[in-house]
Swiss-Prot record:
This is Myosin regulatory light chain 2A, cardiac muscle isoform. Gene3D superfamilies: EF-hand (1.10.238.10). It comes from Gallus gallus. GO terms for biological process: cardiac muscle contraction; heart development; muscle cell fate specification. Residues 24-59, 94-128, 129-164 form the EF-hand domain. Disulfide bonds: none annotated. Signal peptide: none annotated. The keyword Zinc does not apply. The keyword Metal-binding applies. InterPro entries: EF-hand-dom_pair (IPR011992), EF_Hand_1_Ca_BS (IPR018247), EF_hand_dom (IPR002048), Myosin_RLC (IPR050403). One of its GO terms (molecular function) is calcium ion binding.
Amino acid sequence: MAPKKAKKRIEGANSNVFSMFEQAQIQEFKEAFTIMDQNRDGFIDKADLRDTFAALGRLNVKNEEIDEMIKEAPGPINFTVFLTMFGEKLKGADPEETILNAFKVFDPEGKGLKSAYIKEMLMTQEGRFSQEEIDQMFAAFPPDVSGNLDYKNLVHVITHGEEKD
């Protein structure tokens, strides 16, 4: 009988987390989780984070930095824990700040995100964009001379509908 109670309590905890977001948001978080779960074992671990950073062009991430990220979780990071962590961070958050923080996870030093990687991700992940949609976005937000996307301006336009002055 004890296992049934434990199972119900766990299911209840999960449903609270899932009720914090709309279905479309949950799907977007699932896609982000899948991208980060590089070894496809259902958990995000140190190796997954290191591989994700490498895919974004950050090859020299310190072990301490990755350890700090992992320590934010109460245990192994499965999708429910991942969603809970984002839910806690997003409570009462400003939409512009929230989106910027999502980009900053992959650009903590503020050096920029390579537009080639962004293009690839937008075209290959679930809910993918067409080549025409990608071309339109990069026509409006061309990469800088280093090939980086000005995501701060992009986020401002997404949340405010106009470019920063």
